[in-house]
Amino acid sequence: MQATFLVKEAWELLEKSMVYFRGRPVGTVAARDPYVEALNYDQCFMRDFVPCALLFLTNGRSEIVRNFLIETLALQSSDKQMDSFNAGQGLMPASFKVELWDEEQYLTADFGEHAIGRVTPVDSCLWWLILLRAYVKATGDIALAHQPEFQHSIMLILKLCLADRFDMYPTMLVPDGAFMIDRRMGVYGHPLEIQSLFYGALCSARELLTGRRGEFYKQIVNQRLSVLNLHIRQYYWIDLKRLNEIYHFRGEEFGESAINKFNIYPESIPYWLTEWIPETGGYLAGNLGPAQMDFRFFTLGNLMAINSSLASDRESQSIMDLIEQRWQDLVGYM
């Protein structure tokens, strides 16, 4: 009885958070608190709407998700400029809000030019692709994804994500604050959450692309998926066996025969980690780069790696074993 009441109350709160544009629901606001100044919490954030969208889809309420996808697609072509510099065409906004001008409603987007630290959202376009696939799977409305403007949008995102860059890794290099929240969290580099989203977005794009140009992009996507999969599974994985290997690494190795390819220093391993990881558990590291391995456990990155099959079956089981055996540390009383 109590659970039923809580679910009913949750739905009522979700209904009150819905954003309407010209009479149609297009998203949900980040937060509704009448006692706190809104700041930008009165906007609909791309990443924040995704769990709400999945809930709507599982309950057969796909209209709001379809409207969200269409309106954010239109915002993708908005001006993305700060100090006379234009950002990449495939960029999706971090958030948007409904504004009234001359008694007419308009959607205004924030691509990071208003964010704290002025950081561009890297994850928005990745979440958008994943949500588009989820919508198609839930409704069977593949015609929406096959519309020319949607195909063009998918290719713009791929062009942005797969561009040549100064990097030897198949992972995506991103600045701090470019996902989750626009605050410094020590995640500059190749954070797991972005790699998991990147992998899921590439898999989604591969399913949704059509036509001759689509086939061309599928080949590029397939190439990246295979090397990204290998890279994450081989180098990001942490369990007791892997920790023991790192403890025996030698630093400053050079050449093709180097075992310690990322020059990880054994003394950088937190003293508590060997006691914390259970014998049957393991997880994917939070970040990896030259002389840097982030040993923090990032739940969303690991769970998305399972969801997208970026993690192997064995790794997926080990991650779930870790969460189960360290439930109090990771979940607590939530």
Language-model regions: role of each:
Residues 1-334:
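Acidic, mature catalytic/reactive cores of soluble proteins
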